[in-house]
UniProtKB/Swiss-Prot annotation:
The gene is rny. One of its GO terms (biological process) is mRNA catabolic process. This is Ribonuclease Y. Pfam families: HD, RNase_Y_N. Residues 333-426 form the HD domain. It is a single-pass membrane protein. Keywords: Cell membrane, Endonuclease, Hydrolase, Membrane, Nuclease, RNA-binding, Transmembrane, Transmembrane helix.
Length: 517
């Protein structure tokens, strides 16, 4: 029984100890749980603070962005407003000038009317005076000659008519001279205004370009083995390449500005690259030609934008850029056309015409010069046909014809273009007749060679003393090349006048290319 009691007491003690241990464990777990809960709460609170901070930053950034956009929009609106205000101010100023001009014209008209009234009064007085004298003379004649009044009246009237005709002719001649002098004075004033308001740049075109090189070793590489590279360059580029004892320089000579510019760029790229060989020359030449086509279009677009013109066909825009590489009597065609455009606009505005239309006609009046190397015909006919094809304004077409006297100028704008063309061309030093005659002669040389069947291209070199003709190897054989050279030489002798002799050099080259795959 004692053992049972001891066992019971032990069980109770064990249960008490177990309860205490369990309670302590539960208390520890509870404390851990509370700590974890607090940690989670702090983490959530921290995360909430971060979210709130991000939200505040987002709101602040949004406010700044909205404020920035608002300021930009406000600035743009203010800028547009200022621009429109300036435009309105200019228009208002122009209207005031026109109003002043109208007032001056009105005053002049009033003075003219008063002058006419005074003249009419003088005529009436003279008429009355002549009538009185006529009556007196009739009485004297009747008394002294025995003539009837009608007969005497006829004699007197005839005499008076003769005297009156002389006086009227004198008055008419006087007013005609005054009108001519006034018109001449006004024309001189308008031309003086136009030339004083426009100052164009002018630089004489050269027939050579000088390329600077670092050392004379490059000259040898450009010449190549047995002159292979320089021959390829001259054949592909169609220019004369002069390599002499001049230190650090190679000269590119050609009458064609476009070919000379391309040749200069090709040689500069080859010198920079260092790989100078026939295949590389052709590769660089093809690349430069594409770049020049893009540059020409860009040049035309810049000119059109600077002149404030619109709705010009892209093909015409490209030809405007191409005028940069054309010259007439030593004067650059694009520079000349720009001068004419600006001067024509000013003259037309002074005469009450459309300034914008006059500038359009001015820039396009010589557009045919961009086509003369590729098509037959005068630049006037080529330019007019081009503008008709692309539906240009009739005033533009009339200006193209009128500036060389093919038609009469039918508008203020056309007349302004004719006057501006004369001003630009007649300016001292603007043109050189001898140079133009030389360019015409070498162009004729190339045209004669190109007119033959089977000819791919032709280049006049050595100042026109040699014509290099590139034959199509698939259309012309070796025997026909000899005949072609003789035919071209014979036609040159028949159609042209020149000092010394001209060498005709027909080149036929056949290339077979295949790729191993």
């Amino acid at each position: 029984m004692i053992e049972s009691l001891i066992a019971l007491i032990a069980a109770i003690v064990g249960l008490g100890i177990g309860y205490l241990v369990a309670k302590k464990i539960n208390d520890a777990k509870y404390e851990i749980f509370v700590e974890q809960a607090k940690a989670k709460a702090k983490a959530i609170e921290y995360e909430a603070e971060l979210i709130l901070k991000d939200a505040k930053n987002s709101i602040l950034n949004a406010e700044l962005e909205v404020k920035k956009k608002y300021e930009e929009k406000t600035h743009k609106i203010q800028k547009d407003f200022n621009q429109k205000f300036d435009d309105l101010s200019k228009k208002e100023q122009k209207l005031q000038q026109e109003e002043e001009k109208l007032k001056e014209d009105k005053e002049y008209l009033c003075k003219s009317q008063k002058h006419i009234q005074d003249l009419q009064s003088d005529v009436d007085k003279l008429k009355n005076k002549y009538q009185e004298k006529l009556d007196d003379v009739l009485k004297i004649l009747e008394h002294s000659t025995g003539l009837t009044q009608n007969e005497a009246k006829e004699i007197i009237l005839k005499k008076v008519e003769e005297n009156s005709r002389e006086q009227i002719a004198h008055i008419v001649r006087k007013y005609e001279e005054e009108a001519k002098n006034e018109a001449k004075r006004k024309a001189n004033f308008i031309i003086a205004q136009a030339t004083s308001r426009f100052a164009g740049e002018f630089a004489a075109e050269r027939l050579i370009n000088v390329i600077n090189i670092k050392n004379d070793e490059l000259k040898g590489r450009i010449i190549g083995k047995e002159g292979r590279n320089v021959k390829t360059l001259e054949m592909v580029l169609g220019v004369d390449i002069i390599i002499d004892d001049t230190p650090g320089a190679i000269i590119v000579s050609c009458f064609n500005l476009y070919r000379r510019a391309i040749a200069t760029k090709v040689i500069e790229l080859l010198v920079e690259d260092g790989r100078i060989q026939p295949a590389r020359i052709e590769e660089i030449h093809e690349k430069v030609c594409k770049e020049f086509d893009s540059a020409i279009l860009e040049e035309g677009e810049t000119i059109v934008m600077d002149l404030g013109l619109n709705k010009i066909h892209p093909e015409i825009v490209k030809l405007i850029g191409k005028l940069k590489y054309r010259a007439s009597y030593g004067q650059n065609a694009l520079a000349h056309s720009l001068e004419v455009a600006h001067l024509a606009g000013i003259i037309a505005a002074e005469c009450g015409g459309d300034e914008n239309l006059a500038r359009r006609a001015g820039i396009l009046h010589d557009i045919g010069k961009a086509l003369t190397h590729d098509f037959e015909g005068s630049h006037v006919d080529l330019g007019a046909e081009l503008c008709k094809r692309y539906k240009e304004h009739p005033v533009v077409i009339n200006a193209i014809y009128a500036h060389h006297g093919h038609e009469e100028a039918t508008s203020i704008e056309s007349a302004a273009v004719c006057a501006a063309d004369t001003l630009s061309a007649a300016r001292p030093g603007a043109r050189r007749e001898v140079l133009e005659a030389f360019l015409k002669r070498v162009s004729e040389l190339e045209d004669i060679a190109k007119s033959k069947e089977g000819i791919k291209n032709a280049y006049a070199i050595n100042a026109g003393r040699e014509i290099r003709v590139i034959a199509n190897a698939q259309l012309v054989n070796d025997d026909e090349s000899v005949l072609l050279a003789k035919e071209i030489a014979a036609e040159i002798q028949e159609k042209m006048q020149y000092p010394g002799e001209i060498k005709v050099n027909v080149i036929r080259e056949l290339r077979a290319v295949e790729y191993a795959k």
